[in-house]
């Protein structure tokens, strides 16, 4: 039987960043929370899908809360204390994700809505008929 060779994996180095930016991308189907340093380099991220939610459960505020909590805990291991929050998109998890970041122990110093609004650009999807 072949012997298993243990590959020397690259150990991720701990960055010590006290201030960062939390980007919350909230769509109708999912919520993605990315925490970066001020230069834009990703420190931690999580989405409703990576937490374990599938299908329509990903679009709930609770799923967004869990994703934000997971990303915040990971960022706090790198020494993060304060974040500016940039929220993008129309999804259900916007407010829940912000509240979860605060509850996890990160100090929120700024909340900014950066949702892109077209000046009559692309044609939107057709209206749903239920």
Curated annotation (Swiss-Prot):
SUPFAM superfamilies: Translational machinery components (SSF53137). The keyword RNA-binding applies. GO terms for molecular function: rRNA binding; structural constituent of ribosome. InterPro entries: Ribosomal_uS11, Ribosomal_uS11_bac-type, Ribosomal_uS11_CS, Ribosomal_uS11_sf. GO terms for cellular component: ribonucleoprotein complex; ribosome. The keyword NADP does not apply. Keywords: Ribonucleoprotein, Ribosomal protein, RNA-binding, rRNA-binding. GO terms for biological process: translation. Belongs to the universal ribosomal protein uS11 family. Part of the 30S ribosomal subunit. Interacts with proteins S7 and S18. Binds to IF-3. Located on the platform of the 30S subunit, it bridges several disparate RNA helices of the 16S rRNA. Forms part of the Shine-Dalgarno cleft in the 70S ribosome. HAMAP family: Ribosomal_uS11. This is Small ribosomal subunit protein uS11. The gene is rpsK.
